[in-house]
Amino acid sequence: MTLKNRYKESIRPKLLKDLGLKNIHQVPKVVKVNVNRGLGEAASNSKSLEASLNEMATITGQKALVTRAKKAIAGFKIREGMPIGCTVTLRGDRMYSFLERFINLALPRIRDFRGVNPKSFDGRGNYTVGVKEQLIFPEISFDKIDSIRGMDITIVTSARSDQEGKALLQELGMPFSKN
C-alpha cells in the first residue's frame, strides 16, 4: 500500500479521532516537500552545479531549479544573478513517493542513526531535516559522485501547530529520537 493510500484510509481517520477534530478537512496533511541544496562552490565551479542538478533530479524524480544570488556579497565572492544552489518542490504523487523512500529507505542508511530531531519544527507544523550526504539515497551510487554534499528537506504541512505536525509525521512513519 502506498503512503498516499495509507494516509487516506488509515492515518487520516486516526488523526481525526486523536486530535479531536470535527471535520475530515481539518486533519493536517502534507502540502509539499522542498529539497534544497546550497552550493558555495557553484560560483567558481560550474561542474559542481551540473552534478548537483543531476543528483537532485535522480533523487526526487523531478528537474531541479537553479537558485541565484539576489544581491552581490563581496565576502563570498558572488555577484547578483550567479547560481548558488538548486531546489526542488514536490507535490502530489511524487511528494508521497519521495517521502516513502526518504522515511523507509534513506533515513535508516544514515550512520549511527537514532532518529530525527523532534525539535526541528518551525512553530507552524512544518518540519525541516538536514542531510549531511547524498549517499543515503539508494539511487545515488558512490562511484558516480564527485564530492559529498548535503541538502535540506522541508516537509510543509497544513497543521496549525507543532504538535499536530508531529502527530502527522509520526503516523507517516517518521522516526523521531526519544531525547
Swiss-Prot record:
<comment type="function">
    <text>This is one of the proteins that bind and probably mediate the attachment of the 5S RNA into the large ribosomal subunit, where it forms part of the central protuberance. In the 70S ribosome it contacts protein S13 of the 30S subunit (bridge B1b), connecting the 2 subunits; this bridge is implicated in subunit movement. Contacts the P site tRNA; the 5S rRNA and some of its associated proteins might help stabilize positioning of ribosome-bound tRNAs.</text>
</comment>
<dbReference type="Pfam" id="PF00281">
    <property type="entry name" value="Ribosomal_L5"/>
</dbReference>
<dbReference type="GO" id="GO:1990904">
    <property type="term" value="C:ribonucleoprotein complex"/>
</dbReference>
<protein>
    <recommendedName>
        <fullName>Large ribosomal subunit protein uL5</fullName>
    </recommendedName>
</protein>
<dbReference type="InterPro" id="IPR031310">
    <property type="entry name" value="Ribosomal_uL5_N"/>
</dbReference>
<dbReference type="GO" id="GO:0000049">
    <property type="term" value="F:tRNA binding"/>
</dbReference>
<keyword id="KW-0689">Ribosomal protein</keyword>
<keyword id="KW-0820">tRNA-binding</keyword>
<dbReference type="GO" id="GO:0003735">
    <property type="term" value="F:structural constituent of ribosome"/>
</dbReference>
<dbReference type="InterPro" id="IPR002132">
    <property type="entry name" value="Ribosomal_uL5"/>
</dbReference>
<dbReference type="InterPro" id="IPR020930">
    <property type="entry name" value="Ribosomal_uL5_bac-type"/>
</dbReference>
<comment type="subunit">
    <text>Part of the 50S ribosomal subunit; part of the 5S rRNA/L5/L18/L25 subcomplex. Contacts the 5S rRNA and the P site tRNA. Forms a bridge to the 30S subunit in the 70S ribosome.</text>
</comment>
<keyword id="KW-0694">RNA-binding</keyword>
<dbReference type="InterPro" id="IPR031309">
    <property type="entry name" value="Ribosomal_uL5_C"/>
</dbReference>
<dbReference type="InterPro" id="IPR022803">
    <property type="entry name" value="Ribosomal_uL5_dom_sf"/>
</dbReference>
<dbReference type="GO" id="GO:0006412">
    <property type="term" value="P:translation"/>
</dbReference>
<keyword id="KW-0687">Ribonucleoprotein</keyword>
<dbReference type="GO" id="GO:0019843">
    <property type="term" value="F:rRNA binding"/>
</dbReference>
<dbReference type="InterPro" id="IPR020929">
    <property type="entry name" value="Ribosomal_uL5_CS"/>
</dbReference>
<dbReference type="Pfam" id="PF00673">
    <property type="entry name" value="Ribosomal_L5_C"/>
</dbReference>
<comment type="similarity">
    <text>Belongs to the universal ribosomal protein uL5 family.</text>
</comment>
<keyword id="KW-0699">rRNA-binding</keyword>
<dbReference type="GO" id="GO:0005840">
    <property type="term" value="C:ribosome"/>
</dbReference>
